[in-house]
Design a protein with these regions (language model features):
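Domain-level signature for soluble enzymes in the chorismate/prephenate branch of the shikimate pathway
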Residues: 1-224
Length: 224
């Protein structure tokens, strides 16, 4: 079947950006339609009756492992990365080994008749993930005030400054910028940036149009 929207996690308050998703936004030719923040609750899950001292390794999605790094270090556990937390919980159930635990949800523990050995184990008590809804065609949300763009610059001194200067001169607030290496290039980078603004504002539209004309690569990911 076909779906109009997908949901992807782009950033976590503890572990930072999910770089693979940023790559997918560019490589998959996707646009951002909206965003929302959600509190993420992680539990340590194992065979019923397991004591923490019995656990030697923990399995989960890489982001969950990063978000729970303090407890993993405290218990001295080795880590194994899995494609998602549900797969990790199933892995523990299939292994039926007290030395292996998973990071996942209490619901997943119930599904596989496992036990929550320790609850809410994220390093940060305010463990929040930002999710975006994505689609193929650009869709501006009602009341949109956030703009996401991706661009590259020429590899010459001052090139990034010249990109950012128009934002300052027009009072456009830059809330985030980070770089990602371009695969197969010799230390060339894509820059992902979030701005405060609305593309229906003539000043904002003018700045973005100028950048699109001047830069080697420029894409408006979304206004939401």
């Amino acid at each position: 079947g076909e779906v109009e929207y997908g949901i992807l996690p782009v950033e976590n308050s503890c572990a930072g950006s999910v770089h693979e998703v940023y790559d997918l936004l560019m490589d998959g030719d996707l646009c951002i339609a909206n965003s929302a923040d959600a509190h993420i609750h992680h539990d340590l899950i194992g065979i019923k009756g397991t004591r923490l001292v019995e656990i030697k390794e923990v399995v989960s999605h890489p982001q969950a492992l990063k978000q729970c790094a303090a407890l993993i270090s405290e218990l001295g556990l080795s880590v194994i990365e899995m494609s998602n937390t549900a797969v990790a919980v199933k892995y523990v159930a299939d292994r039926n080994d007290r030395s292996v635990a998973a990071i996942g949800s209490a619901e997943a523990a119930d599904d596989y008749s496992l036990e929550v050995l320790k609850s809410d184990i994220a390093t940060s008590r305010n463990n929040t993930t930002r999710f975006v809804s994505v689609c193929r065609e650009p869709k501006r949300s009602a009341g949109a005030d956030k703009i996401s763009i991706v661009f590259s610059t020429e590899n010459v001194p001052g090139s990034l400054y010249r990109v950012l200067a128009p934002f300052a001169s027009t009072d456009m607030s830059l809330t985030k910028i980070e770089s990602r290496p371009i695969a197969g290039s010799d230390f060339d980078y894509l820059f992902y940036a979030d701005l405060k603004g609305d593309v229906t504002d003539p000043v904002v539209a003018g700045v973005l149009a100028t950048l699109k004309m001047q830069l080697p690569c420029f894409k408006l990911l979304g206004n939401y």
